[in-house]
Amino acid sequence: MEELSGPSSDTLATVESSSNEPDKEVASPDVAATATLSSVEEPGPNPTATPPVWDRGGPLQQVACPVPDSCQTSSTTRGVGTNEDLRLPRRRPPPGKQIPCSSPGCSLSFPSVRDLAQHLRTHCPPTQSLEGKLFRCSALSCTESFPSMQELVAHGKLHYKPNRYFKCENCLLRFRTHRSLFKHLHVCIDHGQNPAPPPPPALDKEPPVPERPPESDPSSSLGLPFPLLEPFTSAPTGPFLPYLNPAPFGLSPPRLRPFLAATPGPPTSSTAIWKKSQGATSSPRRPQGGSDAPSGACR
């Protein structure tokens, strides 16, 4: 009866433990929520320790990674490798960088390109003539002299005009440019070293016209008053008349007389006939009533 009157200590312990279990199960979601909040609010690595992305040459916008611990290393390596390869080259040097002079023997450096350009002018001064030195013109029959090379070049344009030419000293041929003259000199020198080719054969001269024998001269045999002219054997008519009997040697008969004066004359018989006919025609008139009058004449 005493055992039933009051619960034992063991039963009380079991009841308390069973009553506390729902409380623990109810409180477990709260603990999980606080754990997730703490994990989200847990700060990552110090942002000041990692330089911003634009300093490493990447884009200006930065996207937060959902898992900062896992993608921290990948973002740094990715920004250094690919972004630097794809970006445009920088025209302006970063602040604090000095640009060295590229002239040999000069170790100066400048913060900007403008300062470097002004410094380079000291290494490349404009061309100036020496004091007291005169530049003379090299053209023939020209005695002009100038204090600077620029004036001499401007003066040289007066001698060498666009229609200038270059002459070969061997064959006296003229060329427009030096290159064409040099090409010709190779050919001209080769021809000068080789023996000259034989001259081309002269044109065949026209065979001399054979002289007619004296016996075949019809004028001498007929006793014509003009032995130098060829008589026409017939009287041809038509448009071919001037082509049938052309003058010998292509000259008119009056112009042939000095050339044919040295030719042998006709035989003695024809000469006698010529003199006889000439004497008969050119005999002087006899006076009328003279002693030489014919016997049958009227007195």
From Swiss-Prot:
Compartments in which it is found: Nucleus
PANTHER family associated with the record: ZINC FINGER PROTEIN 414
Function: May be involved in transcriptional regulation.
Zinc finger residue extent: C2H2-type: 99-123, 135-159, 166-190
Record GO cellular component, one term: nucleus
Region of interest: Disordered: 1-102, 193-228, 254-299
Domain of life per record: Eukaryota
UniProt biased composition (Low complexity): 217-228
Compositionally biased spans, kind Basic and acidic residues: 203-215
UniProt GO molecular function: DNA binding; zinc ion binding
Keywords noted in UniProt: DNA-binding, Metal-binding, Nucleus, Repeat, Transcription, Transcription regulation, Zinc, Zinc-finger
Polar residues composition bias: residue spans: 1-20, 70-80, 268-285
Family affiliation: Belongs to the krueppel C2H2-type zinc-finger protein family.
Protein name: Zinc finger protein 414
